[in-house]
């Protein structure tokens, strides 16, 4: 019998979008498997009125408070109220900034313009996500040259989820299927400023994934899931990548995050060499 999780309130305040804060909060909360966090998120806290509204809710539902704010007056007010109602209040950037300051021997100068950098990063990721969705599975191939990364591979090699993951990190990503006897789009071969990477996996893994996919009536399902056919598709994909000098990543035993990490490393080298 599964025990019901205990709940607690997790308040996260930021003078920006709060995405870094949320990621940290959720990562830590997930370590406590017998507890369930009730999240209260307060982004774009820029003035005392906005902070006081958040504080009203914190007083009603006390819990752990995490924050990232530059304004010293707002930080002091938040810390004062949390101390008064006896709840933890943690500035998640403070120890990191202190470590940088200590190691570099240079005091930290927090700047308001850093907020604009955060906003620019947020919109860059939104733009990348829009591009990636538009260029999923070979769609909108006419402007592939705008992509930072183009993933190629046969069906069920994690091209789409990997593309979405990269887009959420601000990388414009397109993915193009490699299908035997189907010509590659000219726009793919002309994308000289994009890093093109082949994704492959074992025939066993691909067959297993394909068997769990409903493709509707009239589809040649046996051919699609047959390991011998899949092995031939993989040989074709490898030959294409070898022909054009595209690096290949085997995703058989990699998580999406691990695949993305390998892509980031390749992208860094690619940009250095340009």
From Swiss-Prot:
Residues spanning the signal sequence: none
Keyword match Ribonucleoprotein:
no
What are the binding positions for ADP in this chain? 153-160
The organism is: Bartonella tribocorum (strain CIP 105476 / IBS 506)
**What Enzyme Commission number(s) does the record list for this chain?**
2.7.11.32, 2.7.4.27
What EC class is this?
Answer: transferase
* Catalysed reaction, written as an equation: N(tele)-phospho-L-histidyl/L-threonyl-[pyruvate, phosphate dikinase] + ADP = N(tele)-phospho-L-histidyl/O-phospho-L-threonyl-[pyruvate, phosphate dikinase] + AMP + H(+); N(tele)-phospho-L-histidyl/O-phospho-L-threonyl-[pyruvate, phosphate dikinase] + phosphate + H(+) = N(tele)-phospho-L-histidyl/L-threonyl-[pyruvate, phosphate dikinase] + diphosphate
Question: Could you identify this protein by its name?
Answer: Putative pyruvate, phosphate dikinase regulatory protein
Key words, A-Z: Kinase, Nucleotide-binding, Serine/threonine-protein kinase, Transferase
* Pfam assignment, any one: Kinase-PPPase
Under Gene Ontology molecular function, one entry of this record is: phosphotransferase activity, phosphate group as acceptor
Q: Which family does the record assign?
A: Belongs to the pyruvate, phosphate/water dikinase regulatory protein family. PDRP subfamily.
InterPro entries in UniProt: Kinase-pyrophosphorylase, PPDK_reg
Tell me, what does this protein do in biology?
Answer: Bifunctional serine/threonine kinase and phosphorylase involved in the regulation of the pyruvate, phosphate dikinase (PPDK) by catalyzing its phosphorylation/dephosphorylation.
């Amino acid at each position: 019998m599964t025990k019901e999780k205990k709940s607690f309130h997790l308040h996260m305040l930021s003078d920006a979008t709060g995405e870094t804060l949320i990621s940290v909060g959720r990562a830590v909360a997930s370590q406590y498997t017998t507890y369930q966090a009730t999240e209260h998120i307060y982004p774009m806290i820029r003035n005392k009125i906005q902070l006081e509204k958040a504080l009203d809710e914190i007083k009603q539902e006390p819990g752990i408070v995490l924050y990232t704010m530059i304004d010293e007056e707002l930080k002091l007010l938040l810390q004062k109220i949390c101390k008064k109602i006896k709840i933890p209040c943690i500035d998640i950037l403070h120890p990191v900034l202190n470590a940088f300051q200590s190691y570099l021997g240079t005091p930290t100068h927090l700047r308001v313009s850093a907020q604009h950098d955060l906003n620019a990063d947020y919109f860059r990721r939104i733009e990348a996500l829009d591009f990636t969705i538009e260029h999923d599975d070979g769609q909108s191939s006419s402007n592939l040259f705008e992509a930072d990364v183009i993933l190629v591979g046969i069906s069920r090699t994690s091209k789409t989820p990997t593309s979405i993951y990269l887009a959420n990190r601000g990388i414009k990503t397109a993915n193009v299927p490699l299908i035997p006897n189907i010509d590659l789009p000219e726009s793919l071969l002309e994308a000289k400023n994009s890093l093109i990477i082949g994704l492959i996996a074992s025939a066993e893994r691909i067959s297993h994934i394909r068997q769990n996919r409903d493709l509707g009536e009239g589809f040649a399902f046996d051919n699609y899931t047959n390991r011998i056919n899949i092995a031939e598709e993989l040989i074709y994909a490898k030959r294409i990548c070898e022909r054009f000098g595209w690096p290949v990543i085997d995703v058989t035993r990699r998580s999406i995050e691990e695949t993305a990490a390998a892509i980031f490393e390749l992208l860094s080298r690619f940009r250095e060499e340009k």
